[in-house]
Amino acid sequence: MPLVNIKLAKPSLSKEQKAELIADITELLSTKYNKSKERVVVVLEDVENYDIGFGGESVEAIKAKASK
């Protein structure tokens, strides 16, 4: 059973976009790896900007600098 965990930085996708992403990932794994769609699990997690870092700085701090 494939399990795909995708983390998305907030602000995240809309409910409709998330549903489309889940359907697309499920279709990809089903087609490419011959897996039953019913066996594919997709988990989407929204992550706060202060919980993601690039180059030693949080995304929140990077965005704050860019907006000045």
Curated annotation (Swiss-Prot):
| Keyword Lipoprotein tagged | no
What protein name applies here?
A: Probable tautomerase Cj0270
Judged by the first EC level, this protein's enzyme class is isomerase
Disulphide-bridged cysteine pairs: none
Task: Tell me which EC number(s) this protein carries.
Answer: 5.3.2.-
Q: Where are the transmembrane segments?
A: none
- The residues responsible for catalysis, as annotated, are 2 (proton acceptor)
MF annotations from Gene Ontology: isomerase activity
Q: Does the keyword Isomerase apply?
A: yes
SUPFAM superfamilies from the xrefs? Tautomerase/MIF
Q: Please list which residues make up the signal peptide.
A: none
Which family is this protein grouped under?
Belongs to the 4-oxalocrotonate tautomerase family.
Highest taxon, organism lineage: Bacteria
Pfam families with a match to the protein in the record: Tautomerase (PF01361)
Q: What keywords appear on the UniProt entry?
A: Isomerase
